From Swiss-Prot:
Mg(2+) binds at E33, D62. Binds 1 Mg(2+) ion per subunit. Catalyzes the decarboxylation of 3-keto-L-gulonate-6-P into L-xylulose-5-P. Is involved in the anaerobic L-ascorbate utilization. The gene is ulaD. NCBIfam families: PRK13306.1. This is 3-keto-L-gulonate-6-phosphate decarboxylase UlaD. Pathway: Cofactor degradation; L-ascorbate degradation; D-xylulose 5-phosphate from L-ascorbate: step 2/4. Its EC number is 4.1.1.85. It holds the Pfam family OMPdecase.
């Protein structure tokens, strides 16, 4: 089983704030995510600028595309994104359109599982050639005190068994990682637990060490 990658979510509102994070921890992570908040605040230039600074890193545009899949994904890929996200409630043709464009750029599409979705949809995504999903505990659910539970672990295992590369996100803390041991997680996303740490560098390194210990 290969080691899960570590992704930092830049849900900053400005590029200046995002740069404060990347200057410290870009070399400690595998993937730099231009979070939805940053995408809205700064547009696709955030993707372009971060990829220019870190060409050796995977840069994800977390656009959460809900419609106009070809147009929006092309905007992201032309800004040199490696991956883009499509929200799970989008029509299957939106996901297909985004994937078609991704292939032109040797990129990839992730389905963001935020909110309601079904296993029938999951099968449609697989049938359409989608390889990646993001299992997401929402920011608002976290704020309401919703913790990771057995239902989450069961769903993640089932998605993996279907052949998806599964990314896990949603207020992920270091102590949560052992919950997922034994599952071939593709990526773990950490946002505030790295960005807001007293030492973001050490926080990122602790995540990497824990991943190596649990999956190595």
């Amino acid at each position: 089983m290969s080691l899960p990658m570590l992704q930092v979510a830049l849900d900053n509102q400005t590029m200046d704030s995002a740069y404060e994070t990347t200057r410290q921890i870009a070399e400690e992570v595998d993937i730099i995510e231009v979070g939805t908040i940053l995408c809205v605040g700064e547009g696709v230039r955030a993707v372009r600028d971060l990829k220019a600074l870190y060409p050796h890193k995977i840069v994800l545009a977390d656009a959460k595309i809900a419609d106009a899949g070809k147009i929006l994904s092309r905007m992201c890929f032309e800004a040199n994104a490696d991956w883009v996200t499509v929200i799970c409630c989008a029509d299957i043709n939106t996901a297909k359109g985004a994937l078609d464009v991704a292939k032109e750029f040797n990129g990839d599409v992730q389905i963001e599982l935020t909110g309601y979705w079904t296993w029938e949809q999951a099968q449609q995504w697989r049938d359409a050639g989608i390889q990646q999903v993001v299992y997401h505990r929402s920011r608002d659910a976290q704020a309401a005190g919703v913790a990771w539970g057995e239902a989450d672990i069961t769903a993640i295992k089932r998605l993996s068994d279907m052949g998806f590369k599964v990314t896990v996100t949603g207020g992920l803390a270091l102590e949560d990682l052992p919950l997922f041991k034994g599952i071939p997680i593709h990526v773990f996303i950490a946002g505030r637990s790295i960005r807001d740490a007293a030492s973001p560098v050490e926080a990122a390194r602790q995540f990497k060490r824990s991943i190596a210990e649990l999956w190595g």
